[in-house]
Amino acid sequence: LMLMLPVMVSTWVQPINLAINTNFASTLYEGSGVSAVNYANTIYSIIVGVFVLSIANVIFPRLSRMSIDNDKESFGNTISATLEAMAFLIIPMTLGLMVLSSPVISIIYERGKFDSFAVEITSKALFYFSLGMPGFGIQNILSRAFYAKQNGKMPLISGIVSIGINIVLCVLLVGKMDVGGLALASALSQ
């Protein structure tokens, strides 16, 4: 029960950051920046949801059991092995999505009013969102480790810091990189 508030706040970080980015995006391309950020974030969220969150959710009960048993060595080894396995999956996926951001967006969205310019700005956002995959993976595994140890304070602090970093980076990058800067702010704040 004591973990409820920190867990709730931690799960709100990504939607809060997206809302912040969307607010900044509303000033770009006569409002089309909002669509670019949201469409790119949808693709990004599906990919990290399938891979990162699946791994994090599978590992949590095991970490909880090890924490209850006070098996510190296995706990640490499991976290290390999970981070290594995730890196093995996430780094190539990150690079692949960066390289293929334009074709992915074009295949999925380009039709009707979603023209080549929309593909260009949305793929730019997806390119930079992709950089956040490794950080998102690490953050999710380490948060689960803290929760398994009944420590909600660190993920809560991490979430609050993430939101602050995202705001600062949005302010600094939106003028220089438009939707790419907003997506990069989100990626770096993971």
Where are these regions (language model features)?
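Membrane-embedded alpha-helical bundles of multi-pass transporters/translocases
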Residues: 1-190
